[in-house]
Amino acid sequence: MLTRRQLHTSRGDIKLEVFCESVPKTAENFLALCASDYYNGSPFHRLIPNFMVQTGSPASDPKSKASATIYDTPNQLFEDEIRPALRHNSRGIVSMANKGVNSNGSQFFITFAPAPHLDGKNTVFGKVLEGTEVLDELEKLEVDKKSRPKEKVEIKSVTMHANPLAG
């Protein structure tokens, strides 16, 4: 089953395909957070040209590095779903940001270029279908010494697109 979400950002829309069957726990967490409006107002808080842009922190605190999940675990994090077939092999790969093994929450990133050094370390759960021009704009943003965009760019909202081929 293909599931599509559209990130409506302050720079334009990015349509994503989420790999529900390949990484069900990661997909369920992402989709549930989208449905609960968790990502609304979430800033793109880390940007490294030729690498990636990261988002998914709570909108209430733009400087927060916090993360949340739908899973009732002691640390509010969940395990990796590393799949050898899902790789960081192109621009527009959507993957979980983490702080090490089995430390996934709400934060994720979109690659600007292949990042094979992340294969086996970060869970790939989707890819960009449309909106590469928005990625182009994001990648050109000026950043500070800590790789934070100097201009505020955020996810305004997320919408679902039904798959007309689903049964």
Located regions from the model:
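Cyclophilin-like peptidyl-prolyl cis-trans isomerases
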Residues: M1-G167
